[in-house]
Amino acid sequence: LAMTEDTVARARLQKEINELSIRSSEYVIPNEFNRLINRFGGSGLNAATSYDATIYFNTFSPQYMVQWAEINSERLINPVFRLFQSELETVYEEKNMYGDFIGGQVMDTLMARYFGPHPYAYPIIGSTKNLKNPRLTEMHKFFEDYYVASNMALILSGDFDAQQVMPILEKAFSRIRSGNAPKQEKVMLPPFNGRETMKVKFPIPFIKAMGLGFRGVSA
């Protein structure tokens, strides 16, 4: 991904969509999604955003495969961001919590030093400036651009018969819009000159720590 101000904004939008998609779709009331998952034996409903993927996950009982597929495909097809403003508070809270964690501040500084101008140099949740300027229209556009079938993958693990499950999944998830997500420009990592040393200072007394970073094999 090319790291620009637009890319930072996209990362923020994805985080906000995560929070909203857990709670709403066209045919349910706020928080009803979680109750539906629980009703059909599900638990652990959550979402996560990393530098390279967005993941929605939960556990559920195999006998409710039909209901699970219907519910989870629906939120990828007909989400309604009616809780946009209230759910921003959840994102703000997470941003503040992360900012209070000393290790997180140090890691952000190190990532910015060793990965700039690559996207890995920027916090996933975005900057405070980004979070203070939300636009619902941008969120809708992000969803339309990136939530297409060719940009998704479904992973199931557990005790079930794959031959019986495939028709259920195809019926539910084939309703997701087809299309291709926007092509992203590749950004090369800056050269790593072997041993580099940097010091990070924060106004916290009596705490000293050392971290070691290694350039791994490219994905």
Predicted features, each with a name:
Residues 75, 171-176:
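Conserved short hydrophobic interaction patches
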Residues 162-166:
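Extracytoplasmic/secreted cell-surface and envelope-processing proteins
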Residues 1, 59-88:
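M16/insulysin-pitrilysin zinc metalloprotease superfamily fold
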Residues 1-63, 85, 95-151, 175-219:
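Non-catalytic beta-strand/loop surface segments
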